[in-house]
């Protein structure tokens, strides 16, 4: 059993449950609503009809509201500083650098990327 977000030729993006090779849609607005309802409750509300894997397009399971990306992971920072003959500044450990990026740039399996 796997949770997914899918679309079909007839319906736009909707949460679903994949059981073996069948896809059962869920009566929720999105995957965040499924999580809020609880996995067990959501799973008990699957559609009676099911679709084959070939009948759906899979998308990013959860569309993030915001998205952060880290400047670099520790080993990269250590190596880069060592190559310059310096130690990693203590501030890097206290205030790791990150930035906000575009949450609309998240795509799912086989999505067409513009």
Language-model segments: which ranges?
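Active-site microenvironments in enzyme catalytic cores
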Residues: 2-11, 25-28, 34-114
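Well-ordered beta-strand scaffold positions
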Residues: 21-22
């Amino acid at each position: 059993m796997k949770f997914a977000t899918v679309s079909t030729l007839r319906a736009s993006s909707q949460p679903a449950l994949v059981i073996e090779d069948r896809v059962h849609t869920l009566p929720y607005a999105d995957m965040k609503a499924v999580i809020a309802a609880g996995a067990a409750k959501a799973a008990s509300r699957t559609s009676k009809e099911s679709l084959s894997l070939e009948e759906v397009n899979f998308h990013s399971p959860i569309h993030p509201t915001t998205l952060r990306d880290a400047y670099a992971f520790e080993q990269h920072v250590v190596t880069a500083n060592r190559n310059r003959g310096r130690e990693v500044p203590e501030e890097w450990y206290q205030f790791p650098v990150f930035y906000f990026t575009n949450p609309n740039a998240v795509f799912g399996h086989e999505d067409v990327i513009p």
